[in-house]
């Protein structure tokens, strides 16, 4: 057996005998920062190799909610806004925070109406997603909204939005060429493209 074959055998052996138990040990924790949306905690830990270290975790107090609207002609709607943390403009599907303890579908309906003025008669959950699992516990749910009716948008006072209606195929191209980088939007568009290609819509 050569070195390459040995490494492959070792990987298979490990996969057969791996455990999903938590290898991290927390020895202490300290609250670093808190506001109405996030909390930052610093943990003193023993890492999986047995060495001491620190780990910072950002806890999100709201669930991330995303909605991909799709009309009967397979047009979708994107929302453009300047994202403060990135210091750049971003095209995304309608998104927002859903308070814990509230049905996420109700939050999705609210976000869609606020940002686009749309209401949908048909709702399908298409994806659940961790958005940045190395530093945060942010959890997202993505919905596909169909059978759309147009009303007036109701944006929040912190939002300066541009709404763009476009063919879904164009939104898919924007993902493929890097014009859309928001992780929930990328996941939603790729999932819907898969559903379309498999005739599941």
Q: Where on the chain are the PLM-derived regions?
A:
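Active-site-adjacent beta-strand/loop module that shapes the phosphate/pyrophosphate-binding cleft
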Residues: 41-49, 132-151
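Short aromatic/basic micro-patch
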Residues: 92, 142, 165
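Positively charged N-terminal leader segments that act as targeting/secretion signals
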Residues: 1-12
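Short, solvent-exposed loop/turn elements at beta->coil junctions and helix N-caps
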Residues: 29-32, 127-132
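Acidic, metal-coordinating catalytic segment for phosphate/diphosphate chemistry
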Residues: 29-66, 72
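Conserved Nudix-box catalytic region and its N-terminal flanking loop in Nudix hydrolases
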Residues: 21-23, 58, 66-110, 157
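Nudix hydrolase/Nudix homology domain
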Residues: 13-24, 89, 100, 125, ...
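A short coil-to-beta-strand element that immediately follows conserved catalytic motifs
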Residues: 119-126
């Amino acid at each position: 057996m050569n070195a390459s074959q040995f490494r492959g055998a070792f990987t298979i052996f490990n996969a057969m005998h791996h455990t999903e138990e938590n290898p991290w040990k927390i020895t202490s924790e300290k609250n670093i920062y808190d506001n109405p949306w996030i909390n930052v905690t610093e943990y003193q830990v023993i890492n999986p190799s047995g060495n001491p270290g620190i780990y910072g975790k950002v806890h999100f107090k709201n669930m991330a909610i995303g909605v991909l609207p799709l009309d009967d002609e397979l047009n979708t709607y994107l929302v453009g806004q300047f994202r403060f943390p990135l210091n750049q403009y971003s095209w995304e599907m309608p998104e927002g925070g859903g308070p814990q303890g509230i049905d996420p579908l109700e939050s999705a309906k609210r976000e869609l109406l606020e940002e686009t003025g749309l209401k949908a008669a048909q709702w399908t959950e298409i994806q659940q997603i961790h958005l940045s699992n190395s530093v945060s516990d942010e959890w997202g749910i993505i919905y596909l909204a169909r059978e759309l009716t147009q009303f007036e948008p109701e944006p929040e006072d912190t939002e300066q939005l541009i709404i763009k209606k476009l063919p879904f195929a164009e939104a898919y191209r924007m993902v493929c060429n890097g014009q859309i980088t928001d992780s929930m939007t990328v996941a939603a568009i790729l999932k819907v493209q898969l559903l379309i290609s498999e005739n599941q819509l």
